[in-house]
Amino acid sequence: MNTEKVYILEDRGILYINGPDSEKFLQNLISNDIEKVNESKSCFASLLSPQGKFLFDFIVVKHKDGYLLDCEKRIVDQLYKKLVTYKLRSDVEILNLSNEFVVAAFNHEKFLSIEGAKDELGYTTKYNEDHVLLDPRNKKLGGRIIANLEKLYMSLKKMKLKSSNIEEYYKLSFELGIPQSNMDQLQEKLFGIECNFVELNAIDFKKGCYVGQENTSRIKNKDKLNKRLLPLQVKKGSIRSEEHTSE
């Protein structure tokens, strides 16, 4: 990822979970430990079905007295509705701020050049009062900034970053085995642990109960996966017979 490039991810949506019960509310639902998340630490997490199947994944960022969920925009309304069904009597407010906030990704080295930044997965700081963090899944995905649309371009200009084709970013992501697009096609088809969520730091096996925790722990204890998401590269051409004929 070039140090001068930035990828404005307009296909990302933002939910804001706020209120006195916001921490407890998320802790009882998501696969990661919300207590890890603070002003200097963000995390990757998922919301699973009661059977432990994949439903949604997102990055959790501390924001004021609540939390921002950075997720794929095409399923942000689904995630919003699912969270509302779990709300019950919890004193929380769930807002869809996708029209107010924008997410952008940029180079790992560029992130480290920001004052106060640390080379730690999920490390979070502020730049021009906006949240900037090192992607909690893989450092090669670089830094992320979550900002109000008007302020975003001011921050990017100040950082001397030029907008580039987001396909470059997603190509890198897929090569790393981290799909971020059309995730609704995986819903209810794979267990969360089969989506490489352990390797991507999305599951905390030491935290208490959450939705789908029982099957997730059972599969982990068996230490055997029947399926797993992997990147696949398709090349043009034909295979010569001598390349696949054994003696």
Predicted regions and their residues:
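Basic, glycine/lysine-rich polyanion-binding surfaces/domains
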Residues: 1-242, 246
